[in-house]
């Protein structure tokens, strides 16, 4: 079995992954040709190329991925990591991505395909560890084994395509295909082997033995990401159905614009007209077609309105289906008022998918940071405190003015605390994301806001501010009385 063999899981999903890659641009869809749009019977190659060029890709899949990714990433990730690890955040990968860019990439790929991977690695000669990122199609074949009560990754092959200078011209590059093999050897230690395709087969290089603080690893530092769970075995991506609908929509647009082409350029026909050798019929205002045959006919052939209407109806139906599958991001605004309960029911499944992707990304990035922390020599105490938190509040609704007024009245009457009021503002993103509730209270209680403090919390607090004897807002109620 060659080193670039793929697992049965990858084989089952690779066609869908390729389709998703092609849906990223109209050019890729058209270049794929008969993979998606069949060549009509009797069409020449030139006619087929003109036929498929008339199609138009409706970017439903791409826009939905951007929308779902944006829902998770609209607030920056919150991270607690050792200082030595945070120092790596600005230059996190081999191609210079920072921490937030890495998280966004993981979320995007989880939304698109539901499978992704990161290898934590460092140069063979040592140095700063970096992250190497692998798309679903590049993760060829993981091998796992039960050791005790755990399922351990003991082998993994990864496809890589790198550009290297040409031997005959150093100013030009050529793409070299290689497979990076990660495995646990017979002695229980981690090693890497690069296999390069020289045109006649795969040639294995010398083994590489990565170390952490001078010690060889006993585990493979590769982290898998998924949409529903972080597993070595890939599952169908959350938007695969949307991808198939988008392809079907593209196929029908090819027929639609092909039909419009012939509607705009109707074909003339004539029957029963006798022509001499070399003679032809011409169209023009000064030309008339005359025949002695009473059965002669002439006219223009074109597609009827009913045919175009049927295609338009099919396109409209597909767009509505994509709207449903794609979390309603493409849905047109509906007339009338929808109840909050009805809206909540419609959003529940969408939010569950987003929440699952966010949770899986959190867990995977936590493991990545743990590997980095070990690599830079962080203590076990520091490692135990590592945490990654992504946004799981996907509601973008604005504050109802009546709700805000009612809460402010409750604040002034002493039926809710200052902290509760500020927490509400924090959740609704009225307060800056980087500012804590305690910092907001300190700003409110600053000397510049004495008049406002008196209006909101009473004269006792205002006097304390003036005298520079600030009292915590949590120990003073809204009537200015100490609690």
Predicted regions and their residues:
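Extended, helix-rich architectural segments
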Residues: 1-134, 454, 460-483
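Short secondary-structure junctions and interdomain/linker hinges
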Residues: 20, 75, 79, 95-102, ...
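Non-transmembrane, amphipathic alpha-helical segments
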Residues: 103, 303-310, 314, 346-357
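Amphipathic alpha-helix face/heptad-repeat signature
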Residues: 106-110, 245, 311-314, 318, ...
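Extended, regular secondary-structure scaffolds
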Residues: 111-113, 117-229
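Intrinsically disordered, low-complexity linkers and terminal tails enriched in Pro/Gly
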Residues: 196-209, 294, 465-481
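Extended, charged amphipathic alpha-helical segments
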Residues: 203-342
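C-terminal helix-loop subdomains that flank or include functional centers
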Residues: 289, 317-483
């Amino acid at each position: 079995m060659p080193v670039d063999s793929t697992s049965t899981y990858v084989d089952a999903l690779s066609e869908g992954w390729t389709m998703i890659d092609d849906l990223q641009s109209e050019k890729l869809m058209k270049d794929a040709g008969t993979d998606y749009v069949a060549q009509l019977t009797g069409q020449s190659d030139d006619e087929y190329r003109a036929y498929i060029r008339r199609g138009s890709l409706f970017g439903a899949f791409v826009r939905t991925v951007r929308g779902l990714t944006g829902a998770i990433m609209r607030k920056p990730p919150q991270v607690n990591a050792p200082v030595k690890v945070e120092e790596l955040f600005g230059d996190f990968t081999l191609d210079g991505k920072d921490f937030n860019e890495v998280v966004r990439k993981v979320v995007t790929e989880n939304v698109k395909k539901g499978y992704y991977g990161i290898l934590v690695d460092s140069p063979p000669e040592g140095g700063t560890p970096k992250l190497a990122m692998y798309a679903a199609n590049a993760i060829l074949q993981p091998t796992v084994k039960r050791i005790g009560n755990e399922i351990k990754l003991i082998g993994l092959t990864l496809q890589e395509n790198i550009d290297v200078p040409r031997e005959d011209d150093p100013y030009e590059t050529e793409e070299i295909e290689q497979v990076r093999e990660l495995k646990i050897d017979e002695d229980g230690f981690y090693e890497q082997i690069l296999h390069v395709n020289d045109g006649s087969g795969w040639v294995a290089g010398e083994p590489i033995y990565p170390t952490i603080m001078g010690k060889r690893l006993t585990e493979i530092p590769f982290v898998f990401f998924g949409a529903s769970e972080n597993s070595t075995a890939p599952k169908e991506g959350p938007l695969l159905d949307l991808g198939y609908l988008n392809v079907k929509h593209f196929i029908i647009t090819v027929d639609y614009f092909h039909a419009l082409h012939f509607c705009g350029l109707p074909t003339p026909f004539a029957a029963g007209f006798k022509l001499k050798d070399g003679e032809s019929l011409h169209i023009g205002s000064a030309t008339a077609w005359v025949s002695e045959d009473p059965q002669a006919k002439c006219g223009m052939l074109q597609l009827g309105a009913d045919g175009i209407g049927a295609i338009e109806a099919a396109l409209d139906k597909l767009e509505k289906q994509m709207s449903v599958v794609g979390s309603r991001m493409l849905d047109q605004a509906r007339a009338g008022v929808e109840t909050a309960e009805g809206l909540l029911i419609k959003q529940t499944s969408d939010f569950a998918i987003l929440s699952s992707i966010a949770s899986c990304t959190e867990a995977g990035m936590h493991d990545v940071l743990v590997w980095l922390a070990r690599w830079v020599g962080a203590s076990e105490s520091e490692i135990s405190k590592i945490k990654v938190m992504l946004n799981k509040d996907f509601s973008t609704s604005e504050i109802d003015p009546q709700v805000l007024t009612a809460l402010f009245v409750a604040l002034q009457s002493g039926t809710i605390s200052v902290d509760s009021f500020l927490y509400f503002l924090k959740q609704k993103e009225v307060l800056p994301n980087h500012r804590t509730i305690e910092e907001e209270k300190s700003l409110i209680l600053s000397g510049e806001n004495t008049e406002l403090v008196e209006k909101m919390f009473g004269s006792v607090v205002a006097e304390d501010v003036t005298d520079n004897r600030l009292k915590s807002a949590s120990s003073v109620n809204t009537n200015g009385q100490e609690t």
